[in-house]
Amino acid sequence: RRTPEGAGADLARIMRHYLAAWGGKDFSLIGFSLGADALPPMIANLPPDLRRTVRQVVLLAPSRNVELEFHVSDWIHDDEAAQDIALLPEVRRIQPVPLLCVHGRDEKSSLCTELSPQEATIRSLPGSHHFDGDYAGVAALILEHLRRP
């Protein structure tokens, strides 16, 4: 079982590699589904110097909770386990990083519906977890968000 601290250390190692390899200075972090669920606790556990390099975060179809361990059975049923991490407090830990949260209107459980407009830019798209296949529309939302200063 992964811990938020261990996952944050993994993300830190990847970020340091790409800062050196590409000579960049900041990151926009984007996650879909389980990736969107895992990002907030990972970012919250980054060292302060790397936290300052996170310019924007985009969460696509996030749940309300995450277990940092994948099981194939999770695709069949999505039961909340006692060891699940609630994402709302984790998102609040990474504030004031600009956050875009995108969810499908037909999704039954989404972190996006728990966030206030002060905490995130929230976009609701037609469909469920895969946004009725409108990936061009999702990409346009992401690009619009990333263009913001």
Where are the predicted features?
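Second-shell loop/turn segments in exported
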Residues: 1-5, 28, 128-131
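Alpha/beta-hydrolase active-site loop
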Residues: 2-22, 41
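A structural signal for isolated positions on well-ordered beta-strands in alpha/beta enzyme cores
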Residues: 28, 56-58, 100
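Gly/Ala-rich beta-loop-alpha elbow adjacent to hydrolase catalytic centers
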Residues: 30-39
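Hydrolases whose catalytic domains are alpha/beta-hydrolase-1, hotdog thioesterase
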Residues: 38-42, 68
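A conserved short beta-strand
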Residues: 50-65
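The feature captures the conserved acid-bearing segment of alpha/beta-hydrolase catalytic domains
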Residues: 62-119
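C-terminal catalytic histidine-bearing segment of alpha/beta-hydrolase fold enzymes
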Residues: 114-115, 119-149
